[in-house]
């Protein structure tokens, strides 16, 4: 699952404040029970709720991003009964990725979190990287995506197995944008398209749900959240992809201003399946 959860300190005095939608947000994750989750915009209140109410997940918080406190995190959650962390880390999307920094006219400092995960009881491993590209600077999105591709190659090169790589994130870019091409030209496959879906969907909806498109017809579809796979050896099979549009119809609340998305993968050789 990839889920921009909308930070818990945002919208504090509004209907969509975290305190009003936390139950629905947590319940949505619990209902679909993915094995791995890439969170974007996770702040202390969000993570505290997940620690308490989704306690079976282990957390890899990753480096903070943003310009000031409260910081955001691209945290990875995983089910330790199915997966074990073999290595993990993070970096900033900048010309100096080893430290909290900004480059390329980015509005705020941005980061990525990664984890090399092993499937318990098997010799299967895969790399998961989770990120959130800038919402203002097109240059930052382009250069950030290039850096992510390079870092994945670097991390994979340190392993003996050359694992499949899965990237989750809020890319603040439509699929017809240069950012998407940076990934596909580097061998990544968009799980939404690979699962047989057609373009025209939104993943960002500004807490308006299906009404968002009617309110902003000139903007067109905004499928800006993706789950991407690079697996040149064909070890993983993309079985499905869904955009989760759950909402509380009585209150009109949504879990976030983005829909969570989820893909299901199967390993060709073993039949093992997991939900990302």
Where are these regions (language model features)?
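N-terminal, active-site-proximal structural segment of metallo-dependent hydrolase catalytic domains
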Residues: 1-53, 64-72, 146, 269-276
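Acidic/histidine-rich helix-loop elements
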Residues: 2-23, 93-107, 134, 211
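Active-site metal-binding loops of divalent metal-dependent hydrolases
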Residues: 3-5, 131-133, 170-171, 259
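Structured beta-strand-rich core segments of catalytic domains in phosphoester-bond hydrolases
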Residues: 36-129, 133, 240
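Active-site neighborhood of phospho(di)ester-bond hydrolases with catalytic His/Asp-centered motifs
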Residues: 37-40, 62, 166-170, 190-194
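Metal-dependent phosphoester-hydrolase catalytic domains
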Residues: 82, 139, 153-165, 173-276
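His/acidic metal-ligating clusters that form di-metal
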Residues: 111-129, 138-181
């Amino acid at each position: 699952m990839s889920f921009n959860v909308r930070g818990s300190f945002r919208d504090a005095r509004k209907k969509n404040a975290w305190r009003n939608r936390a139950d629905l947000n947590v319940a949505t994750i619990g209902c679909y029970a993915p094995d791995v989750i890439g969170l974007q915009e996770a702040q202390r209140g969000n993570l505290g709720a997940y620690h308490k109410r989704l306690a079976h997940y282990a957390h890899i918080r990753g480096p903070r991003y943003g310009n000031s406190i409260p910081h955001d995190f691209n945290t990875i959650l995983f089910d330790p009964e199915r997966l074990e962390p073999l290595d993990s880390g993070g970096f900033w999307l900048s010309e100096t990725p080893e430290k909290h920094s900004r480059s390329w006219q980015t509005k705020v400092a941005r980061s990525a979190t990664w984890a090399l995960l092993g499937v318990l009881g098997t010799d299967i491993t895969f790399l998961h990287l989770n990120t959130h590209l800038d919402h203002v600077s097109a240059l930052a999105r382009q250069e950030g995506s290039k850096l992510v591709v390079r870092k994945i190659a670097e991390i994979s090169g340190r392993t003996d197995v050359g694992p499949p790589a899965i990237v989750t994130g809020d890319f603040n870019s439509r699929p017809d944008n240069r950012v998407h091409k940076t990934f596909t030209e580097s061998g990544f496959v968009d799980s939404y398209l690979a699962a047989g879906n057609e373009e025209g969907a939104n993943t960002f909806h500004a807490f308006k749900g299906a009404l968002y498109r009617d309110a902003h017809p000139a903007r067109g579809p905004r499928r800006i959240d993706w789950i991407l796979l690079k697996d040149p050896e064909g070890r993983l099979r993309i079985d499905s992809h869904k955009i989760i549009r759950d909402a509380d119809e009585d209150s009109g609340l949504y879990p976030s201003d983005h829909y969570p998305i989820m893909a299901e993968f199967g390993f060709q050789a073993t039949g093992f399946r997991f939900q990302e």
